[in-house]
Amino acid sequence: MATKIAGGLHRAQEVLQNTSSKSKKLVDLERDTADAHTQQPLTTDHGVRVSNTDQWLRVTNDRRTGPSLLEDQIAREKIHRFDHERIPERVVHARGTGAFGNFKLKESIEDLTYAGVLTDTSRNTPVFVRFSTVQGSRGSADTVRDVRGFAVKFYTDEGNWDIVGNNIPVFFIQDAVKFPDFVHAVKPEPHNEVPQAQTAHNNFWDFVYLHPEATHMFMWAMSDRAIPRSYRMMQGFGVNTFALVNKEGKRHFVKFHWIPHLGVHSLVWDEALKLGGQDPDFHRKDLMEAIDNKAYPKWDFAIQVIPEEKQDDFEFDILDATKIWPEDLVPLRVIGELELNRNVDEFFPQTEQVAFCTSHIVPGIDFTDDPLLQGRNFSYFDTQISRLGINWEELPINRPVCPVLNHNRDGQMRHRITQGTVNYWPNRFEAVPPTGTKGSGVGGGFTTYPQRVEGIKNRALSDKFREHHNQAQLFYNSMSEHEKLHMKKAFSFELDHCDDPTVYERLAGHRLAEIDLELAQKVAEMVGAPIPAKALKQNHGRRAPHLSQTEFIPKNPTIASRRIAIIIGDGYDPVAFTGLKTAIKAASALPFIIGTKRSAIYADGEDKTSSKGIIPDHHYDGQRSTMFDATFIPGGPHVATLRQNGQIKYWISETFGHLKALGATGEAVDLVKETLSGTLDVQVASSQSPEPVEWYGVVTAGGKQKPESFKESVQILKGATDFVGKFFYQISQHRNYQRELDGLASTIAF
């Protein structure tokens, strides 16, 4: 039976996958893909069929079991393969997940480059994207406070192009030679291997204080950017400065950006902490779930461009990876769109073995003298050799879709068989020739831009690299009030975990006082550092667009792909339940039924003799409010049961404390009011009135609900007057931060 079910599921999956056209890369991978659900007999790795894989060959008789025999080559192979399944994990970005998709160019930038992927709007370029955390090991949690990796591999007709980016546009260091020291400092401390996947320890904060260049970056790391709600709701940045070269040989400096269609949203810190234990796979499951439900994540692809002749026109060095190019100075130009639409078939050979290199560029794109990029170009290629071997680019997930032919040979795990008698250039057959400089340009070989270089060989950076505070101030000034509040709390949490007074006293009392005095004073008071009396550097007061996440709310409110919990017990109101569930699905969101049990639950007026009931997706003890974007409780007699359950009340309180939308109808309105009214004057709908009331993101409607109150198709508007419209609008805003700013959330125990 299990085999039949598995086979049926697999066939259904195949049908779904075959309904859409496959990209060149997916077709390429098919030759290395095997079906694990087939009835084909089990074999050894050398192709011999296996008759028994459950018992080791041994000496036995009727009375006892004797010794196992070493001659059992099948058992030995099975154990040998198991013993060698693991490979070295990535030193950084070890914890990650990935998906396939497509990149579509919307606007040709032929004025800037001759790269086909950025000039040919008829192309649909296959991509593989890997999201990751930076600090933790493969087994760490998804929701830690950390930078997120956002690496994109384009399988272009001219070769693979990798944008090895992050969800934060700057980095901690300017020069790649400091990378080993930085990673040593951010990783668990060497004497006890503690803490895992956290910056909240002495060594990290010691390092960043002693490296003022890290100031801008750690401001980002203490912001909400470091605890994203979803990989689908975070920006991506190329971090480094690259160059674009056009057919005329003119060079422009460029930075790459990814902007999510769903907006840029984050968890709250208490929620992130709890999810680390409740669902450590939260982000990877969220991505897979969205793709499985055809809520395909999308990002706009944008560039910032500076002509070569204007390189020196800014107060900062445009090659400094610890600096952004403010958008009011260098506007974004949106030119394409990325969509992720297929999950991996097997994690290890695809997500774990995928390898990205900043040195993977295609003709029309070039490197710059960005000192961090220069070192990354060496390090990334080198680390792939360590992890995967010298022939790592022959692995299915890494190989290009365009022809590959050269004179490279041999090495461990070489796959390709090359015919012919020569393996060098030049050769008497003129076989496999380089294109030469005449072949550069569109469709030709890679040609390095002929950059003029002059200077003195020494170990130094130019003068503009020495300024480290202006953009840190710019970032903090640009935050909204709730974002600033979250940053104060983040610094206070992190430095509270530092037990060396030298570390937290100078960071709070000195470095932060160079950014913002009020921030420094608040953090110093919380962590027990001397409170600075004056700013150590005058704040310039400038702000910049698109640094605050509040500027990325979608223009048209949407709840697409949002996870909404509906809590029910025996005796729930079927009208409100069915009406809202239907409306949620119609809005492309995901309803999850949370029951008092995961067995049949009956609506008001039903029992097992008159109805099959509803089987919930989960029971309340198997999930937590942290795993959902909003919660709805319909009315009905079941509320009497819910009222007696402390965990349900905690669910309500936690939803409120985490600033999420909370909806209730009928008898459930009083349950919500009772739960939250300990210290609050909760404003809810009258128990007899169906007119909806919205109060700090809590949407209620009293009385018995009528079917016409729940429209299947709802236009989500700020001024909606119906219950569903009001509730959906609150969900679309992600969180009700005014609830926090007015001090309401802090009065609730959660």
Swiss-Prot record:
<feature type="active site">
    <location>
        <position position="93"/>
    </location>
</feature>
<keyword id="KW-0560">Oxidoreductase</keyword>
<dbReference type="InterPro" id="IPR043156">
    <property type="entry name" value="Catalase_clade2_helical"/>
</dbReference>
<dbReference type="GO" id="GO:0005829">
    <property type="term" value="C:cytosol"/>
</dbReference>
<keyword id="KW-0479">Metal-binding</keyword>
<dbReference type="Pfam" id="PF06628">
    <property type="entry name" value="Catalase-rel"/>
</dbReference>
<dbReference type="InterPro" id="IPR024712">
    <property type="entry name" value="Catalase_clade2"/>
</dbReference>
<keyword id="KW-0408">Iron</keyword>
<dbReference type="InterPro" id="IPR029062">
    <property type="entry name" value="Class_I_gatase-like"/>
</dbReference>
<dbReference type="InterPro" id="IPR002226">
    <property type="entry name" value="Catalase_haem_BS"/>
</dbReference>
<feature type="active site">
    <location>
        <position position="166"/>
    </location>
</feature>
<dbReference type="InterPro" id="IPR020835">
    <property type="entry name" value="Catalase_sf"/>
</dbReference>
<dbReference type="GO" id="GO:0004096">
    <property type="term" value="F:catalase activity"/>
</dbReference>
<dbReference type="InterPro" id="IPR018028">
    <property type="entry name" value="Catalase"/>
</dbReference>
<dbReference type="InterPro" id="IPR024708">
    <property type="entry name" value="Catalase_AS"/>
</dbReference>
<dbReference type="GO" id="GO:0005782">
    <property type="term" value="C:peroxisomal matrix"/>
</dbReference>
<keyword id="KW-0576">Peroxisome</keyword>
<dbReference type="GO" id="GO:0042744">
    <property type="term" value="P:hydrogen peroxide catabolic process"/>
</dbReference>
<dbReference type="GO" id="GO:0046872">
    <property type="term" value="F:metal ion binding"/>
</dbReference>
<keyword id="KW-0349">Heme</keyword>
<protein>
    <recommendedName>
        <fullName>Catalase A</fullName>
        <ecNumber>1.11.1.6</ecNumber>
    </recommendedName>
</protein>
<dbReference type="InterPro" id="IPR011614">
    <property type="entry name" value="Catalase_core"/>
</dbReference>
<keyword id="KW-0575">Peroxidase</keyword>
<dbReference type="InterPro" id="IPR010582">
    <property type="entry name" value="Catalase_immune_responsive"/>
</dbReference>
<comment type="similarity">
    <text>Belongs to the catalase family.</text>
</comment>
<feature type="region of interest" description="Disordered">
    <location>
        <begin position="30"/>
        <end position="49"/>
    </location>
</feature>
<dbReference type="GO" id="GO:0020037">
    <property type="term" value="F:heme binding"/>
</dbReference>
<dbReference type="Pfam" id="PF00199">
    <property type="entry name" value="Catalase"/>
</dbReference>
<feature type="binding site" description="axial binding residue">
    <location>
        <position position="380"/>
    </location>
    <ligand>
        <name>heme</name>
    </ligand>
</feature>
<dbReference type="InterPro" id="IPR041399">
    <property type="entry name" value="Catalase_large_C"/>
</dbReference>
<comment type="function">
    <text>Catalyzes the degradation of hydrogen peroxide (H(2)O(2)) generated by peroxisomal oxidases to water and oxygen, thereby protecting cells from the toxic effects of hydrogen peroxide.</text>
</comment>
<keyword id="KW-0376">Hydrogen peroxide</keyword>
<dbReference type="GO" id="GO:0006979">
    <property type="term" value="P:response to oxidative stress"/>
</dbReference>
